[in-house]
Amino acid sequence: MARRGLLLVLLALLALPIFSQTKYALVIGLGKQEDRAWPKINGDKDVPRVRQMLRKGGYDKIISLVNERATKRNILSAFNTLVGKARPGDIFYIHYSGHGQQVADPHHDEPDGLDECWIPYDAYKKACARDRGERHLSDDEVNYYLGQLRDKVGDRGKILVVIDACHSGDATCGDEGEEVLRGVSEVFDATCHFAEPIPRAVSRRKERWITISACTSAQSNAELRNPVAGRLTYALWQILSDQSSMSNAELERRIRRFYQGIRSRVYQTPVITGEYKNLQRISDFLR
């Protein structure tokens, strides 16, 4: 009997690595750019709040890329690191606070002829000798790495992407003083393919994760003035820091209420998308 009990304990211990879930995070925040033509924003100020929220939610494997460290090379390296570490059932939180920009699609695989891009530290606002498009981080590239993560973690794994940016807008807006917007309306005219072309069959995969965006594609994303922060980032920090469990519909309602309480001329609506949005609770990523 004792021998059988010992055997059961050993089997349970052996099974632990199979069913354990490790939490990983990549947090990118930009308030500075190599190209000074970009409007000044404060995405770097979001990082401490995001890290605090993640630590409270049990994340101890966090990669933070802020300002000068958030080059395209470093961001791709971080994605490769996460893919290399991913195991079935693992949990991944990806956060981007910074500018967004649309780029004339060099691969001709977008219906509207435009790629939506995150703006790393070394990306330029206009095409030039230093950046012909290869320093922008396209949605195809981001989706490629997220797809690789999903392949590794399987259906039991969790992937959440938070985008506190937008791909349109101007530097300032409104009659009640300046409002800082993340994103520019000017389309970048890429003169070359991106550094790492992504096969169309891979880049066009379905959104096999959950994405929370600060606004719709037709809206601008304005920062908070006091405290200085991204609207979506601060809303999530306030709503999810107490680790309450709630449906994604309830979370979206609370973010909308938070937005409505802001005195601003910029109207924006949070958006939750992805195949897993009705299968996994966002609040559970931080519990």
Regions found by a protein language model. Name each.
Residues T22-W38:
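Short glycine-rich His-centered loop
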Residues M1-A2:
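N-terminal secretory signal peptides that target proteins for export/translocation
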Residues D44-D90, R130-Y144, F258, T269-V271, ...:
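Functional beta-strand-loop-alpha-helix junction segments that form "active/interaction loops"
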Residues S20-T22, N74-S97, Q102-E176, M246-R254:
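Caspase-like (clan CD) cysteine peptidase catalytic core
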Residues G5-P17:
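Bacterial N-terminal signal peptides
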Residues G29, V47, R51, D139, ...:
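Active-site-proximal C-terminal subdomain of hydrolase catalytic domains
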Residues G31-D35, D60, E68-K72, G98-V103, ...:
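Solvent-exposed loop/turn segments at secondary-structure junctions
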Residues E34-I41, I63-R69, C128-R135, S220-N226, ...:
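Second-shell loop/turn segments in exported
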